[in-house]
Regions:
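Long, terminal "pre-/pro-" and other extracytoplasmic accessory regions
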Residues: 1-79
């Protein structure tokens, strides 16, 4: 039996660590230099334990959803 999300230690504990992982995902997927990426908005969902980070670069924007416990990117949606 595994503990609930509230009892598990989160690897993405801070907003800065979530932004860092999101930028890393964007640089790998879209081949963009990290200094060209701007953080537009961040949100933490207490119910699911997921971080949502909106990033923008050039004329593109994307929302990245990450699991705060496993510190992995779950999905990247370009908008």
């Amino acid at each position: 039996m595994s503990p609930g999300i509230g009892l598990m230690k989160r690897r993405l504990e801070t907003e800065e660590s979530a932004i860092s992982l999101a930028i890393s995902g964007i640089t790998k997927k879209f081949k963009v230099k990290p200094n060209k990426i701007e953080c537009l908005e961040t949100k933490y969902d207490n119910d699911s334990g997921d971080w949502y980070v909106a990033l923008g670069w050039k004329d593109k924007k994307a929302v990245i959803r990450m699991d705060s416990v496993q510190a992995v990117i779950l999905e990247i949606n370009e908008i």
